[in-house]
Each structure stands twice: as C-alpha cells, then as structure tokens.
Amino acid sequence: MLEITEIREIISHFGLSAEAITDFHDTSHNDDDKRWNYVLDNKYVLKINSVGAMWEERLQEIKRLIARYRSVGVYCPDLIPTLNRAMSCSRNIGGKEYTCFVEEFAIYPIIDDEFEHDRKEVIEHLGLLASKYTNVDLSETKSMWSIIDLAPLDIDIDEKQENTNMLTDALRRHGYDLLAQQVDSLNSTLREKIKEVFADLPRCVYQGDLNTTNELYKDGRFMGLIDFNMSGTDVNVNVFLNETNWFPEDEEFDALSVREIISKQDAEQAEKMSVILRHYTLNDLEQYVIPYYKRIVNIFQYPDVCSMIKWLNNDSRREKCACLIKALTEKPL
C-alpha cells in the first residue's frame, strides 16, 4: 500500500491534492493484474492498475462512454484528466509498470444488499442509450456478454460457448449423453442463424456489468453506475436479453414445475424487455434474430449453468433438472 506522500506526488499530475486516504479497496485478480483503489478525502479515487488491465486509449474510450451515460440521465463519476489532458500517468512500483488514473468519488452510495430494488428501473436506460448511440464510436473491446466476438477475458471461445461446454460435460458425467448431444446441436444451430446476420446487427457500447455492486441509489431509487472496466461493444438485442433474463433460484426450482419455470422465464423477460423497448425500436433484422439470442441467453448464462450443474449433482434434483434442460432445448423457436 502506498504512503500518502507517494499518492500526493501521483495526483499532482492531475492538478489535485489530498489530506488523507479515507478508504482503500484491493480488487486485484492476480499478481499480473493488480487493481488498487485509494479513496482520497472522499472526493477522488486514485486507481492504480497493472498496465495490461488498463491503458490510456481505453481510458479515453471510457471517458467518452461516461459522457453518453450522463447524457441519458445515468449519473457516473467522471474521469479526471491530467494537467496535459491525458487520462493517466505511468508509475514504476516495485519494479512493475502501472497505469494511474483518477475518478470522482461517487455522490451516491451503492445499494444495500438487503434492499429489494426494481430491476426494471435499472435497465430502462439501455433503450435510451441504444436509441441515441447505436453504431456511434464503437469500441474495439467487446462486452462481457458478447458471443461470437470475444471479450477481453475470453480465450479461444466466448463465455457462452464455455458455459455450454460445462453444461454438456456435466450431462455426460451423469449419463445424459443424448441430451448433451441435443444441447450441443441446438447451440450450433442458434449460432449459425446468428452468424448469417451478425455483421449487420445494430450495436452500441455498454457499461457491461450491471449488478448491485456497481449500481448507485438515492432514497431507494436507481441513480447511476460505477465501474466501466467491463464496458465494450455488443449487439443491442444480446445485451437487452442478457440483462432481462430470469432463472430460478433453488427454492423456486423446487417449488415450480418445469412448465411453470419456463412460463415464468418468458413472462419475466417479456415484462422487462417492454421497459427497454419503450425507448428503442427493433428493426427487421433484430426481430428476426431475437429468438436465437434469447434461447442462448435462457440456457447458457454462467450463474444459471452453475445452478444446473449443482442440481445435476444432487440426487433429488437431478432428474427434474434434466427435464428442464430438455424442455428448454426442445421448446419451439
């Protein structure tokens, strides 16, 4: 952890000074991906990242994206430029190079874990953003939801394909070889349909990581977002569907029939999609491709695949889980 004197020297390049470190968060992934966050006087956050985790061009991109979010009424703490108008400066710390940048300290708090927030209130801005900025200043970096195109953390295959492989491996371990083949076949068919029109689908740049640890609230109302590390370009309908997907928790899985689970999944998603589509009109190509994206999202989101693998490992839930997977696989498009 840096001393306050070292921090003062770094932030002087941004025209700032600080009395004290008021908080510190280490969100590092590993030794090659360090991410240190120093809250200074509850006014600024100095972020020190390994060079590979953040770089100048990426920060310039994020600053432009923050401005777009603000323009549609979503508050986001802004990045503060250096005195020479760059977004970062470099420092050698312990023999390693780091990118240093400064963000405003958020004026609203992150939501309390116990608060039941209205998801529709959070996702409505997606339609506003897409209606105003589709195909504008697209980033070379892809969002974490991206399929076919690879996001920064993807290696060789996109995350949804990795999730598919995890699920089919689990099915085979438990003797459901035919069902695993059906899942693989469906996934391949869906992807081929998407690839036919993929290049022409409308896209936008998104924050890419909507969850309660990144959402800011005031008096129980959604106000804004922090953390644009996962931001990137994605197909609009893919983002809409990922952010509106519903899947049962353990209690709901036990209480509802397979038919009821699928019915609720469709109803919950349709209700949330209608909020986004108040502000965004799907074109013919998007309407054509939505069923294929929807099926991938409904089956292969990472937390949901983890749930299904857990249920397959449970003697009392295994057969019902296999029935759910089969029903989702065989459901008409």
Per-region residue spans from a language model:
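Juxta-kinase regulatory segment immediately upstream of eukaryotic protein kinase catalytic domains
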Residues: 1-23
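An alpha-helical support segment within catalytic cores of ATP-dependent transferases
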Residues: 12-13, 138, 159-208
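ATP-binding glycine-rich phosphate-binding loop
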Residues: 16-39
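Active-site acidic catalytic loop and adjacent metal/ATP-binding pocket
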Residues: 31-42, 191-238
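ATP-binding pocket architecture of kinase catalytic cores
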Residues: 43-140
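A cross-family kinase active-site recognition segment
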Residues: 116-177
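Active-site activation/catalytic loop segments of kinase-like enzymes and analogous catalytic loops
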Residues: 237-282, 297-316
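All-alpha amphipathic helical-bundle segments outside canonical DNA-binding/catalytic cores
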Residues: 283-297
